[in-house]
């Protein structure tokens, strides 16, 4: 996410009021710059609120939540992080739409992501399950939070590099932080959906959290949704599928989230295979451009 690099005076050359988004607020900040940063700050607030709900849930009853409304505190904790992910997905796009990118917005976004998708899921899962295995459980939570922060630091360090093989081919490096947070909650989704205490087993949750942490900092190529270009012949079918998924999220949200997680995990090997195919094609084109080796005298 990036924010307002171009600040306007709020007036055109003739002194008349210009774009309302360019009106300068007290302190020199423009409304254009404020909007995407406010969305990022809201995402951070949602992530922190998820921790608050988890603390409340851990201090009260620990039974399986009932279905429907009102939501249980464990459900609210997960939902808060998911909403943070939704806001994280739109703040950068809004910044680009408003032409409000800057270094400040990028740094704010990374700091917010490290808390909302690193610290918050780690603490929520620790309070829900891993505290029953105090030492190893805490190490698993710690590893997840640290790997999320390291992934974001790696992304920031590479952002200005010209040579990014994964990015230039339309792929990501490792699992993105918001997706990693959503995947980390898979045992919690299953517990809410089925009521089976086996999914709350701290050893199982700890191993799962360690696996997702590894995927976040790994160098494997993962599919970038923004680079997917469906063929015209299947676009209507894709719209129908998306509509069905949306309806399923409203009627059976937890089972639908389980399905989305499994679908994404099934696509990880496909991303690795697709990138390997792209690498082979690039190597073949480079070899063809270089021409045959010179003949020996």
Language-model segment annotations:
Residues 92-103, 149-167, 217-226, 272-273:
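C-terminal ends of transmembrane helices
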Residues 1-25, 169-297:
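C-terminal membrane-associated helical module and adjoining short loops/tails
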Residues 67, 79-123, 153-159:
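Acidic (Asp/Glu-rich) catalytic motifs at the cytosolic membrane interface
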Residues 31-36, 104-112, 171-173, 224-234:
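Short, amphipathic, aromatic/basic-enriched membrane-interface segments that mark the entry/exit
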Residues 48-51, 83, 87, 121, ...:
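Alpha-helical transmembrane segments of polytopic integral membrane proteins
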Residues 49-79, 121-142, 185-204, 251-255:
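Helix-coil boundary and interhelical linker segments in multi-pass alpha-helical membrane proteins
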Residues 39-42, 77-81, 140-143, 147, ...:
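Hydrophobic alpha-helical transmembrane segments of polytopic
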Residues 1-89, 271, 297:
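Topogenic membrane-insertion module of multi-pass membrane proteins
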């Amino acid at each position: 996410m990036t924010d307002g690099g171009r600040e306007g005076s709020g007036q055109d050359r003739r002194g008349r009021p210009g774009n309302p988004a360019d009106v300068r607020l007290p302190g020199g900040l423009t409304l254009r710059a404020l909007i995407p940063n406010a969305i990022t700050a809201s995402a951070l607030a949602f992530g922190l609120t998820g921790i608050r709900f988890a603390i409340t849930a851990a201090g009260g009853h620990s039974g399986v939540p009932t279905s429907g409304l009102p939501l249980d505190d464990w459900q609210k904790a997960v939902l808060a992080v998911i909403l943070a992910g939704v806001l994280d997905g739109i703040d950068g796009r809004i910044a680009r739409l408003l032409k409000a990118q800057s270094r400040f917005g990028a740094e704010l976004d990374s700091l917010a992501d490290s808390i909302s998708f690193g610290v918050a899921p780690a603490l929520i899962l620790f309070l829900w399950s891993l505290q029953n295995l105090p030492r190893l459980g805490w190490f698993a939570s710690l590893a997840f939070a640290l790997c999320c922060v390291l992934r974001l630091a790696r992304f920031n360090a590479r952002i200005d590099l010209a040579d990014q093989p994964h990015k230039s081919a339309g792929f990501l490096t490792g699992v993105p932080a918001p997706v990693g947070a959503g995947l980390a909650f898979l045992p919690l989704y299953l517990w809410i959906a089925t009521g089976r205490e086996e999914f709350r087993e701290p050893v199982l949750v700890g191993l799962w959290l360690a696996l997702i942490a590894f995927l976040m900092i790994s160098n494997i190529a993962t599919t970038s949704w923004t680079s997917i270009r469906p063929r015209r012949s299947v676009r209507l079918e894709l719209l129908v599928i998306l509509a069905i998924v949306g309806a399923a999220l409203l009627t059976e949200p937890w089972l639908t989230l389980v399905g989305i997680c499994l679908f994404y995990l099934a696509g990880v090997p496909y991303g690795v295979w697709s990138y390997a195919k792209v690498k082979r094609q690039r190597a073949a084109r480079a070899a063809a451009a270089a021409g045959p080796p010179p003949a020996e005298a």
